């Protein structure tokens, strides 16, 4: 279920402050964040965010088609190692 339209999109105030500061300074450094729940705004396009996945910060370069999605959608938190293989040599199931 999506967020109500009357509430509008959400982004952490500290994250918006960091993006504004980068826009003013004309430097493109990586913005470190723990806010996976923040919605990507059009003003974020072209910036690289280091989004925390529970272990480390993973860099995410924001492009135009990412607007409206959450930062956490682009950084998986779980590692899938695959299913166990069947034992076909013995013929057992």
From Swiss-Prot:
**Protein name, please?**
Small ribosomal subunit protein uS19
| A cellular-component GO term for this protein | small ribosomal subunit
User: Known Pfam families for this protein?
Assistant: Ribosomal_S19 (PF00203)
PROSITE patterns named among the record's database cross-references:
RIBOSOMAL_S19
List the Gene3D superfamilies.
30s Ribosomal Protein S19, Chain A
Q: Which GO terms describe its biological process?
A: ribosomal small subunit assembly; translation
Q: Which GO terms describe its molecular function?
A: rRNA binding; structural constituent of ribosome
Q: Which UniProt keywords apply?
A: Ribonucleoprotein, Ribosomal protein, RNA-binding, rRNA-binding
Question: Which PANTHER family does its entry note?
Answer: RIBOSOMAL PROTEIN S19P FAMILY MEMBER (PTHR11880), SMALL RIBOSOMAL SUBUNIT PROTEIN US19M (PTHR11880:SF8)
Q: What family classification does the UniProt entry report for this protein? A: Belongs to the universal ribosomal protein uS19 family.
Protein role: Protein S19 forms a complex with S13 that binds strongly to the 16S ribosomal RNA.
The record's InterPro entries line, in alphabetical order, gives:
Ribosomal_uS19, Ribosomal_uS19_bac-type, Ribosomal_uS19_CS, Ribosomal_uS19_SF
Which NCBIfam families does the entry mention? rpsS_bact
Read off the lineage from the record. Bacteria, Bacillati, Bacillota, Bacilli, Lactobacillales
Can you tell which superkingdom this protein's organism belongs to?
Bacteria
Question: Which HAMAP family does the protein's record reference?
Answer: Ribosomal_uS19
């Amino acid at each position: 279920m999506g967020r109500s339209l009357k509430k509008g999109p959400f982004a952490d105030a500290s994250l918006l402050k960091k993006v504004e500061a980068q826009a003013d300074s004309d430097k493109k450094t990586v913005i470190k964040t723990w806010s996976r729940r923040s919605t990507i705004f059009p003003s974020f396009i072209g910036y690289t965010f280091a989004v925390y996945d529970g272990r480390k910060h993973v860099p995410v370069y924001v492009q135009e088609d990412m607007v409206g999605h959450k930062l956490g959608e682009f950084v998986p938190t779980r590692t899938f190692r695959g299913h166990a293989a069947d034992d076909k040599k013995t013929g057992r199931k």
